[in-house]
Amino acid sequence: MYTAASQANQMIESLTEIEFSNKELQDAYLGEAYFLRAFTHFFLFINYRNIPLIKELPKAPNEYKPQATPEEAWDFIIDDLIKAKDLLPDKNFWDAKNKGRVTKASAYALLGKSYLYRSGIEPKYGTSQTTYYNEAAAAFAEIINGNSGDYRLVDDYSCNFDVAHENNDESIFEVQFVGVLNTGFNPGFVDSGLFNDVRCKMCIMNRSRNSNSSAQVMHNWLYDKFVASKTVTGETDPRMFGSFVFNDNVSEIIRPKGMKVTFLEGKDWEAEMGSKEGTFGEQYELAMGYKMCSRKWLDWTLPPTDDAGGHFFNGRAQGVNWRMIRYSDVLLMYAEAVVMGGKATANITPLEAINKVRDRVGVPHVTEANMRTIEDERILELTYEGSRFFDLLRWGKVVELSLIHI
């Protein structure tokens, strides 16, 4: 992350010295640099909290920065995002070759997220009682109202996690992967690979069956949560099929029309696991008793070779882009910001925002916009997309729910 922040600083310090015939393009590049500097510091701060701020290129080899206070870190991140959203174009500016670059909506989304996180996290630490829910709601409303480009929920939820539908109309900020290069991690270089990519270890289908990494399963409270979510016609929530690998031939699962859980090479549960049992225990001793694992972010079209060069052998690389911020997340964060006291400025209400997310998968409307409905919906919509811990952190529920969900 600090390598990327340093590269962003290099761009910021250099771009103003270069003559551009296209001022919009110069602004777009500068906006990207401010955005990426903000994103890297945001990521570092929410994970480690006590971080130095890299605001400029070092002037000497042994130039070390002190750790910033939380207030200094948030102010720096937010200031960069305000600059970025003023400089960046909407998504229609970029041609097909540049599809997936950050946009004005990317900056507004991360800006709103920063205000929302700051408002929830800092009072829990006692560092500040100031909240920014008005600012968060206003930033999300810019996207919802279409002021920074047209975004929508794609019809098929599962299209948010595959290669074929990368950079779709729901994607607001997406980390681009050029392929499945199995070289070592080499930060700062375009050909840096992702050997030992954690995504391949998330799935029970790690082809190295004796590896501990083949036990990356979901806890059964989450399985029960999804099983309990039904469509208006009584089928299992389609998001369960887009998010996980599990046995869909058991009685509590009612398959929506056209949906079926498949493994590599299109195998169903019984063909892959050699059992009709509802857990992974027969094939994977470490996964005894668990019923599902993650499906997201894996390219299920790759060949399942068992040799050391195979894409499913002991954590080899996957080429699926990471969707860091989706439009559905923006809708739910907007609802949260308003429920927590922010001014409603979008062209839909918080309740309509929540139900818009639910409409996509055909589950019944909720009748009230409150934190309970938002918290539940974020589980169903965003599981295994990297937000759960930070959701609990800003809600002050990390310890409480960690003790329950073990």
Which residue stretches match the model-derived regions?
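Long, intrinsically disordered, low-complexity segments
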Residues: 1-4, 76-78, 99, 157-219, ...
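Conserved, well-structured interaction surfaces
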Residues: 1-48, 62-75, 81-96, 289, ...
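Short coil/turn linking the two alpha-helices of tandem helical-hairpin repeats
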Residues: 45-46, 52, 117-126, 342-343
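An aromatic- and glycine-enriched ligand-binding surface/loop that stacks and positions planar moieties
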Residues: 82, 101-278
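C-terminal substrate/ligand-recognition segments
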Residues: 238-354
